[in-house]
Amino acid sequence: MKMIKSYIPRVAAVNDLSGFGKVSLTEAIPIMSAMGVEVCPLPTSVLSTHTYKFTDYTFLDMTEEMRRIIAHWQSLGLHFDAVYSGYMGSAEQIGIISEYISFLKKNGECTPLTVIDPVLGDNVLSDAETVYYDRMSGLIGAMRKYVALADVITPNLTEACLLLDEDYPHESISEDRLTSMLKRLSALGPERVAVTSVMADKNKMVVGVYDKTLDRVSLIDCGYIDRPFHGTGDIFASVLTGALVKGKDMISASNIAVDFIKCAIAETLKHPEIPIEHGVLFENILSDFFAKNK
């Protein structure tokens, strides 16, 4: 099969598309583009807004269209340097992308990096049970099998607990327990793991990173601000993916992602009138940040 050549790194971004609210694909596309990465979106659903704090939003399931998009891409011989997936609305969608990843690994010029953000629940520390229960039937089990295909996974702490089938730590988590979780998540399949939104103590949040090849655990200090910033998990996964396909190692890529989020939050805090659900002001910092972090 003739392959369509990529002149810069090319990523298939599998996620939902919300018209308003800066989340998922509306973050992945501009962020990775600013990093010098070609982004090919494969929407799992299309919404008028994201679902946090908005009501009466529209929702279009894209399951059947996903099959048609993939079939067309296959006919074109599209090659991807990475597949990055986020929100999956059903076990069926997970199955569709699992098959496509297997196809790319078998038929591509090289094996694409597979980055999976296993979206299963909101990491809301005041109410750790805020999970998408209306869509959970069979999804957690399917996600556990799905992450076995990944090179990299980026769950938040809630999602890490769901994947490992253990209780969420309502207080801060010890370094020993976090290290154990990172290694057990890697045992599910991925060589590299980043767990986000981890409270190391009451005034400190970290990202826990594990690289199985190096058998190395790193804790990246994120600081702590006592309010949520919607969409930062998607930003982390997007920057991480972009940095990895540009040749950065896992620890360096994770540090770049955390630094970008810190800068975006600092920019957002200059405008306290902006509602939380409108997302963070990452647009103002894109050019300067990635010019300095190539």
How should these model regions be labeled?
Residues 216-218, 243-257:
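Phosphate-handling active-site elements
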Residues 251-294:
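Charged C-terminal helix
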